[in-house]
């Protein structure tokens, strides 16, 4: 198990306060209790939530250090959405909407938001029904949710209106990108993951149909 340290968090996310680090450590303990009941993440990764999930999510703050209006789709156990909520608490006026239709997972997300007074809101709807409920974001995130082509279909109402996507992807991301260009054109920046040697964060912008 990787050690919890402010340094590891700052290596992933950039400048982060000691207070935010302490809050994330408390969140990790709370997460472990809930995960034993409702299986928020696979048991194979539950023993290293700090490295595999929290730090993996936190690296988005380094990639985009300024945006204040975010939406995370298919938020599940809160990665990356809840982690970003903790980090966005350090940005004046920042907030994130968490779209999650599973009632138990939405309840978990809402409990964490209330416990830590996070700048976040749960949108308990299916993703395709959430667009009218979420003000136009600057950043859209998703992790371990769907193929890139499906993600683009789900997020097109936002990405074709000026938002950028930050999507965690694994070793097969190039095939997903190639599949997506049959339907969409977009600008793409590949950010190597700081936690997974085979992973990337795909930054997509200027989405338009072809």
Curated annotation (Swiss-Prot):
Location in the cell? Cytoplasm
What would be an example GO MF term here?
Answer: rRNA (guanine-N7-)-methyltransferase activity
Reaction catalysed by this enzyme: guanosine(527) in 16S rRNA + S-adenosyl-L-methionine = N(7)-methylguanosine(527) in 16S rRNA + S-adenosyl-L-homocysteine
Pfam families named in the record: GidB
What domain of life?
Bacteria
The primary site where this protein sits is cytoplasm
Q: Does the keyword tRNA processing apply?
A: no
Is the S-adenosyl-L-methionine keyword given for this protein? yes
* EC number(s) recorded for this UniProt protein: 2.1.1.170
Q: Which GO terms describe its cellular component?
A: cytosol
- Which positions bind S-adenosyl-L-methionine? 74, 79, 143
Task: Please state what class of enzyme this protein is.
Answer: transferase
Give the keywords, sorted: Cytoplasm, Methyltransferase, rRNA processing, S-adenosyl-L-methionine, Transferase
- InterPro entries in the cross-refs: rRNA_ssu_MeTfrase_G (IPR003682), SAM-dependent_MTases_sf (IPR029063)
Question: What this chain does, per the record?
Answer: Specifically methylates the N7 position of guanine in position 527 of 16S rRNA.
Q: Which family does it belong to?
A: Belongs to the methyltransferase superfamily. RNA methyltransferase RsmG family.
The cross-references to HAMAP family, in alphabetical order and at most eight, read:
16SrRNA_methyltr_G
Matches recorded under NCBIfam families: rsmG_gidB
Name by which UniProt lists this protein: Ribosomal RNA small subunit methyltransferase G
Organism of origin: Mesorhizobium japonicum (strain LMG 29417 / CECT 9101 / MAFF 303099) (Mesorhizobium loti (strain MAFF 303099))
């Amino acid at each position: 198990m990787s050690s919890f340290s402010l340094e590891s968090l700052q290596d992933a996310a950039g400048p982060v306060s000691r207070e935010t680090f302490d809050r994330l450590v408390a969140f990790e303990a709370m997460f472990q209790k809930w995960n034993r009941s409702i299986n928020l993440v696979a048991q194979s990764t539950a023993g290293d939530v700090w490295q595999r999930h929290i730090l993996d999510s936190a690296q988005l703050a380094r990639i985009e250090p300024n945006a204040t209006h975010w939406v995370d789709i298919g938020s599940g156990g809160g990665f990356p959405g809840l982690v970003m909520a903790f980090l966005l608490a350090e940005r004046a006026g920042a907030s994130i909407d968490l779209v999650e239709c599973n009632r138990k997972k939405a309840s978990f997300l809402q409990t964490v938001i209330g416990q830590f007074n996070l700048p976040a809101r749960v949108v308990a709807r299916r993703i395709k029904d959430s667009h009218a409920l979420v003000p136009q974001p600057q950043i859209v995130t998703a992790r371990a949710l769907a193929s890139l082509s499906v993600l683009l279909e789900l997020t097109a109402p936002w990405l074709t209106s000026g938002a950028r996507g930050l999507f965690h992807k694994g070793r097969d991301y190039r095939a997903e990108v190639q599949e997506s260009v049959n339907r969409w054109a977009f600008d793409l920046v590949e950010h190597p993951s700081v936690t997974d040697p085979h992973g990337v964060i795909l930054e997509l912008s200027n989405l338009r149909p072809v």
